[in-house]
Amino acid sequence: RWLLPRMHEFYAKHPEILVHIHSRIIREDVQSATQDMTAIICAGTGKWPGYISHKLLTEKLLVVASPAALPDYRCMSPANVAEHSLLNVVSRPGAWSDWFDRHGVDHRHMKSGPHFELTAHLIQAVSAGIGIGLIPQILVQDELHSGELVALFEPIESGRSYYLVYATRYQNLRPL
């Protein structure tokens, strides 16, 4: 959602480079993820032995909702959020617990909602009014600008960033 809109500009600047895009969900196993590829973009800490990483952006998470499904969104407190169906991404099992801990709310009282493998599906579910989502800010920019979704609070840093990662054997490869 954030990469493809930028590819036109990249190709204009670098017409000699051809990029093949494959989507995978990886869990810090950069070696297997890069097995058939020269470089990958992944989220993490940026520290993978045997690999070079270049930070692209720091991830910030936003609590978002559909204003049609939550008309009183302007009056929400972190404790109020726990009373609603909280949508989850399978790859981030503790995201909501961490968010509540940061806001001084006992996460054991939260109302866990459906789980989604893809963040794109979670965004669609939030837009459809199924619940409240905790989503990387960069992935919901269009929905926020259009008013389809609203942010309930200021974004918080997740502790993760997105990186361009490649094996050290490719460090002298010109396109990288």
Residue ranges of predicted features:
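Generic beta-structure capping elements
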Residues: 22-24, 42-44, 66, 91, ...
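Central regulatory/effector-binding core of bacterial HTH transcription factors
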Residues: 1-48
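A late-sequence structural motif
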Residues: 155-176
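Short hydrophobic beta-strand segments
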Residues: 1, 86-87, 164
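Residues that form or flank phosphate/diphosphate-binding pockets in enzymes
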Residues: 2, 73, 174
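C-terminal regulatory
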Residues: 30-34, 46-130, 135, 139-159
